[in-house]
Amino acid sequence: MNPNAVWPRTAQSSLKKHQVSLCTCQRRSHYRLRSFSTFADRKIHQSAGFSSSSKNHDRLSHRAREKLLDREFFLSLLSSASTQREAKSYLARLKAQHQPDLPQKPTSAPASTAKIPPLPSGVNLGSFYGASRSVYETPVFRQGPTPTPRQDQPERLHLALVKLSIPQTLDDTIIDGVAKTLAQLDRLGLTCCVMIDPGAAEDARLLRTLATEQADRLAIAIHKQPDSKSLRLDSVLSVDPATPHLPKVLSRKALLKPLRDGHTVILTPIAYTEDVPRAVMVSADDAVLALTRELAGLATFPDPDEDPLTTAERIGRLQKEVSLDRVILLHPLGGIPAFNWRQSSHVFINMEQEYDDIENELLQARDVISAGDANLTASDILQHPSSVAVSNPLSKFVHKEIVPLPPARSLSPMVPEAQRSAVEGHLENLRLSQKALAMLPSASSGIITSPIEVANSAKTDQPSDLSVVGTRRQRNPLIHNLLTDKPLLSSSLPMSRRGPIISAQGILNPVTSHTTFVKRGMPLTILPNPWVKPWSAQRQPRLRLDDPSIDLPRLVHLIEDSFNRKLDVQDYLNRVNDRLAGLIIAGEYEGGAILTWELPPGVQDDGSAENSARMVPYLDKFAVLKRSQGAGGVADIVFNAMVRTCFPNGVCWRSRKNNPVNKWYFERSLGTWKLSDTNWTMFWTTPGLVEDSQKFRDYEAVCRSIQPSWAEDTGVVD
């Protein structure tokens, strides 16, 4: 058999693991569709729109095209990851997920030799008075319990639930860019289920037609991508007329089967009534929540007569079938605005901590617009600051660290109706993300971004005849998040550290992100509460680490696990209890910071205002559990709370000169100083510290004088 033979479509399709199927719209479209092989096997490949006069040249051109496609894919992959290590680690995880379990080798029990039982008298009389050996060696047939056949558990399906809002306002270039990104996510092991949101209209029939047309449009764009299959599903949702806001999935199997077959499934917010089958439009947000509920295994209602253990096992099996890893909202408005003219959108939202404050901020913006302000801008919102604008550790950047935007880039005024509509859209996206993530495991996350940003980052670089130095490819927010489970920009990174990008044409582009990364997150506990009373160096009853409100054993475990060293607890308590400024705890002691007020050597602690003014705000311990390091934004949450809520006027700390975390510290500090004759580097976030020689000497003296409280000597020179 010739290995280079070109197979016809029918024969080729039978050899592939995943067959290429056409969506409903494509059966009646005029597009000429291309059949693609799977990502793992591209030995056989054909294209309906590609021809050549020579078969050898045809095969060569196909190979060149395949190499170009692979190059484009991996360039997008590597450019979307912060480091090559992140891309490599994700590919290793992806490979491990798809490795089948090795079957266990059957083991045969050794044949046992027949033993002649002793007589009751206890005297061994040989075999003369006993039965013959053949009797003892005769096999005995016993009916044992029938083993339950093991049911092969299907491979867990990793899904992303995507809501694409008002795609009719997007041109074909944007739709193609979104389709390309969805196809790349599928190649990376994240299958996408897309819900089309056509917006609002008075005519329900017109809205249904519009939703169907846009679903077909996206399905065709996805199918044109290499190795991609798309399918528009109808009759997925049902609704009870008594509760039109609570649609539900008609058939779980009908929804999951095309997803398991590798299709990108496109859905519309059309449900069918249960009493009399009739197509009705439902809210796209309600449809997304219904899909989330079903895919999370929470849509089944337990039978009151069913054993609770049986119910739990049944729900557990459903949850093991599917892992809904991402909830992606593609909306022209982009990420949730921070209402700070020095930044465009929230980079990261910890829902457990921030949701109420950000919702109140958006509601307040809506009220200001409703009051009749026709020229409302983001700076106007800051004239009426909410609690999030003043104290939220993940929302407001330190004013002195941020370079103001030029007047030309200020937010342009909008008419009140458009402003109100925009704020309502942001509110809906925020609430939908919160409700969806509340039903999912803490490992799941959400992304709110604009289709334009996704499409622009998916553009193919055009070769240039000029020999110029170009810029790095724009990172795709969806692929970057899949690889790293982090936002494009660290939420604790000051804007002044996000330098401008110089393009090939010499144009300065500020590094901004219109993408918001959302996590269900973790609660943040700050003791004492700085919103009740700001932390002060004045003499007052101070918090102690052995206070009943603090779980000291868990705090000690956090420190020892993070530093990988044993703490001398009593010595540490004796040192910090009388000078403790406060404590920051993220989640269930997954991360934390211990902050103190330190007096420079030689300064008396007499409570005078002069000596109290010389107290140095000091970060004594900054710890994150090993299992939480580098993921979930725990370090960012704690650090932001420290520099933006607890010590907004500045704080200092020290770190060993060879500490690998120093690069992270350097990016977030305002200055560093290597302490001579020691193994320490001093960091600070205090503005103008270098100009104040007395304060600088106090900071340096404190960082030199503090003695460690470790229980054993590990050989590390402090």
From Swiss-Prot:
Keywords: Acyltransferase, Amino-acid biosynthesis, Mitochondrion, Transferase, Transit peptide. Residues 97-116 are annotated as: Disordered. Its main location: mitochondrion. Its EC number is 2.3.1.1. It comes from the Eukaryota. GO terms for cellular component: mitochondrial matrix. One of its GO terms (biological process) is L-arginine biosynthetic process. The keyword Amino-acid biosynthesis applies. GO terms for molecular function: L-glutamate N-acetyltransferase activity. Residues 1-36 form a transit peptide. Residues 539-708 form the N-acetyltransferase domain. Pathway: Amino-acid biosynthesis; L-arginine biosynthesis; N(2)-acetyl-L-ornithine from L-glutamate: step 1/4. It catalyses: L-glutamate + acetyl-CoA = N-acetyl-L-glutamate + CoA + H(+). N-acetylglutamate synthase involved in arginine biosynthesis. This is Amino-acid acetyltransferase, mitochondrial. It comes from Aspergillus clavatus (strain ATCC 1007 / CBS 513.65 / DSM 816 / NCTC 3887 / NRRL 1 / QM 1276 / 107). The lineage of its organism: Eukaryota, Fungi, Dikarya, Ascomycota, Pezizomycotina.
